UniProtKB/Swiss-Prot annotation:
Residue ranges with Basic and acidic residues bias: 10-28
GO cellular component, one term: nucleus
Keyword hit for Cytoplasm: yes
Pfam families reported in the protein's UniProt record: Rad60-SLD (PF11976)
Places the protein is found: Nucleus; Cytoplasm
Location of the Ubiquitin-like domain: 31-108
Species per Swiss-Prot/TrEMBL record: Arabidopsis thaliana (Mouse-ear cress)
Region Disordered, annotated ranges: 1-30
Main location, first listed in the record: nucleus
Subunit description: Interacts with SAE2, SCE1, SIZ1 and MMS21 Covalently attached to a number of proteins.
Listed InterPro entries: Rad60/SUMO-like_dom, Ubiquitin-like_dom, Ubiquitin-like_domsf
Name of this chain's protein: Putative small ubiquitin-related modifier 6
Tagged with keyword Repeat: no
C-alpha cells in the first residue's frame, strides 16, 4: 500500500512503514509511530518527521478509517492527549511508541427499567 502526504515544500511528511525513501536524510529526523484504534486488531505504522505537526498523521489515519480526523481522540503511551498542533518532539515520542486512536463512547438508551427503587 503506497501512502504519501506531501508538504508545502514537496517533501513527504507521513509515510507508511516499508515505503522506499526517495531523499536521503538522517534517521534522527524521523520517528516511527504505531497507531492503534480501539475497535480494530491491527496496528498502523507511520514514519513522520520529528518537527512535523501530527495533524498529517491524524488526517491520514482517519481517512483510512473513513471517519473525520477530529472524531478521534489521540492519546500517547502515557495517556496525554495529542492535539493537531503537536509534533513528535513536543510529545517526546520515540521510535516504536504507540498512539491510541479512540472514538467517543456513546450510550444508546435511557434509564434502566430493571432496577426500580
Amino acid at each position: 500500500m503506497s501512502t504519501k502526504s506531501s508538504s508545502i515544500h514537496g517533501r513527504n511528511e507521513v509515510k507508511m512503514e516499508g515505503e522506499k525513501r526517495k531523499d536521503v536524510e538522517s534517521e534522527s529526523t524521523h520517528v516511527t509511530l504505531n497507531v492503534k484504534g480501539q475497535d480494530e486488531e491491527g496496528v498502523k505504522v507511520f514514519r513522520v518527521r520529528r518537527k512535523a505537526r501530527l495533524l498529517k498523521l491524524m488526517e491520514y489515519y482517519a481517512k483510512m478509517r473513513g471517519i473525520e480526523w477530529n472524531t478521534f481522540r489521540f492519546l500517547s503511551d502515557d495517556g496525554s492527549r495529542i492535539r493537531e498542533y503537536h509534533t513528535a518532539d513536543d510529545m517526546e515520542l520515540k521510535d516504536g511508541d504507540q498512539i491510541d486512536a479512540l472514538l467517543p463512547q456513546e450510550s444508546g438508551f435511557g434509564p434502566s427499567t430493571v432496577f426500580r427503587v
